[in-house]
Each structure stands twice: as structure tokens, then as C-alpha cells.
Amino acid sequence: MVQFAKRNVARNYQDILYLSSPDLSGRLSGTVGARKAAAFLSESLLQAGLSPAGEREYFSSVNVPAARLVGPAHLKIGDHVLQHRIDFSEMSHFSSGGICKGPLVTVRDGDDLSPDQLAGKIVVIPELPPDFDLGSTIQSAADLGVAALLIESGEPNWFHKTVFGSTQSRIPVIRLRRSIAKAVADHPGLKVHLELPLEINVLACQNVMGFLPGINQNRTLLLCAHYDHLGDDPDGLRFPGTIDNASGVAVILEVARLLAKREYALPFNVLVAFLTGEESGLWGSKQFASNPPMPLTAVVNLDCLGFETELHALRIGHQASGDWLTELASSVIKNHGVDVRWLAGGDDSVAFIQKGIPTIGLGQKPTLPESTSIHTVNDSPDNLHLKPIEKGYAIVCDLVNKLVDSPHFWDQENKNI
């Protein structure tokens, strides 16, 4: 058993604060802020005593395509100037950038408008029919020459920001607050002015990796977390990314520090990786899983802790138990009085699972309506709850100890990649 010291709470919290700080500007992949975060993490691994495991010391290059605003977004309908992220937001996965000026045209389910009535117009869809297909709707609008598409998208406190982009996008596509969409829909012909300086670029980024050698060089446990976030908006709106995922990075870093202090070699290698490009489409983990620095036997990914005052539930990255690692992790989680939520998809664990590597994707599953929303300005140190971080750390430590003390678990491994 590894004698894990009680985590250094002050150091752990300072790591989270630094990663969330204005100096890092939201850690958007490929930006100065993300490079500062990577430098901090590599220096932390060096100081902890982990050996470099990247192509260039602690770094491995990753090309990340992503959608990013290069200037403030503006939308004016009639005399009303709308507020970005509160009244409207871009659908980055489907949207191009651009400047559009023109009359508003309302389209409802069952309307039969000619191409001439739509070409060059800015279309608002104020109600979504039950069989609404977003992708085909956007495709049809672009084919008909619609200048921009405004789609009612509920009444959130804040619209979620995304940076997942596509070079196939042809027109600006905007989420619009439902109450605004319904109000303007009754006044077709209103003048609309949209400025969306959204660009899809491929930027050079980096994964950060450190290594602790073990006795059995044929077995390697990967502990990982993504360090990128969404980046602050050009208009100054901050996206600190405290829960997503400064929390996970800080826990994995603290576990790595304490593993490096052990007095004896572990029975297996430990590889620690801080991954980039998660928010843009899992680019860092996809590259890592396709070309790891050594064969991987098992992977533990940590993404998001601190939504609520207590850690009531952890998602595990799978819809059902299917291999030895998920069964082991489920047992450890339950022993800490935490519910296991069998949910899959959306985090870096996906890239490793797709390669057939036993992998769990741990992350707090919010259980309360008032839980902090990630991908909004509310994901900040002021809204972070520390007890889930403490328990998440304890669960990861216990999981590592189970692997140290129970070699028979490793004998169940399906495959080394």
C-alpha cells in the first residue's frame, strides 16, 4: 500500500486558484494563457520528481482545430441591443462567423416560404417542433441562401459557451433566448444587425506528461485530466474554468506529487498527463491514445469536481460495468458513500475506451438544481465547493492502492495497447 500523506490542502487550492486566475485568461487551447498553464504544470511535475515523458521534455505537440471569437459579438434586432451570453450565443459547432444585416423573417413549423422569401434574410425560429432536426435545418437554411439563423434556445441564466468548431459551417447560427425569439417573431421585417467574429483555426498546443517508473515495465497506469478551458471572451467576460477542469488537474497533480515521494518503487509504471484540446473535441486525448509514449494498461481520467457542497455522485465513463477496472472503481466509489452514475461520453476517457484500453472517466455528477453550471461565467473559485475535491482525491488514492495491493486485478486486463 502507498502511504498517501493527507493532501496539502493549501497547495491544492492555490493550484486551482492559479489555473483559474485572470493571468491565464481561461486557458483556451493555443493561447498565451494555455501555454502559461502548461509551463506551470511541467514545472510542477519537475519539482515533484517526475521524469519527462513528452516528445520535448514534458511536452508533446497537438494540433487543435477550434472555434474562437476574435472580437466582441453583437446582435441588434430593431431598436434592441442584445447581450452576448445572456440573450444570445453562437452555436460554435454549427456556425460560421460573419457580419449580417437584413430584415427578419419568421419561420414556424408548417410554413411554406419560397427561396426568394428566405435568401439573404435573417431567419428566426421561435418555436421548435417535436421532430426538430437541428443539423438538417441548418443545412437547408444554408442551401437556400439564408444569411443567418436565430433559434430559440430556452431561458437559461447564461448560455453555455462552446469552442467546438467545424470548417463545414456556412452561415452564422445563433441561440436566442425564447422570450426574445417569440417577441420579435411577431414583427417580421425588423432590421437585424449581427456581428459574429468567429474563426475556425488550427493552433499548435501541447500535452504535458511526466513519468514514474515501476518494477513491472510492462504495466502502466495513466492518470490524466484536461487543463484547457474555453478562454475569456474578447469583451472581457471571464471564463475561469475552476470546476472544468482546474479541479481535476489539481487533484491529479497532488496525487502525482505524493506518489513521487514514496520510499519504494510501485509494481507498475505511472504516467501522468495533462491534456489539451478537450473542449474543442478531445484532440489531446485522441492523439495521446493513438500514439502513447508507452503501452497503456489502465487509464483514470478526472474531469470536474466541486459542483455542490458534497460529492453525492460520480459518473464513471461507462453505461454499464464491462471490465475489471470499472468494477474495481465502482467498488471503491461506493465504499466512500458515493453513488456511481453509469454515464458515458463527453470527456477524454472516450478516446482511450475507443482504443480498447480499460479506462474510467471520473467526474462529479450534479444532483441539485442549484448546482454551479460549467461553461458559464459562474464556473469560478467563488462557486467552488471543496469537500468534493477532498473526497475525489481520496477515491483516486484508494483506487491506486487497490491496484498496488491486488495484482490479480491486473491479471484480468484484456489488452495492452
Residue ranges: model-predicted function:
Residues 275-372:
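Metal-dependent peptidase/peptidase-like ectodomains
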Residues 8-24, 29, 40-52, 122-128, ...:
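Catalytic-core environment of secreted peptidases
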Residues 14, 21-119:
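Noncatalytic luminal/extracellular "stalk/propeptide" segments of secretory-pathway proteins
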Residues 5-32, 48, 52-57, 61, ...:
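N-terminal capping segment at the start of a domain
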Residues 82, 87-115, 163-241, 257, ...:
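Soluble metallo-hydrolase cores and metallopeptidase-like ectodomains found primarily
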Residues 1-5, 23-32, 61, 104-106, ...:
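Second-shell loop/turn segments in exported
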Residues 257, 369-417:
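His/Asp/Glu-rich mid-to-C-terminal helical/loop segments that flank catalytic regions of hydrolases
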Residues 112-153:
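A conserved hydrophobic secondary-structure block that centers on an alpha-helix together
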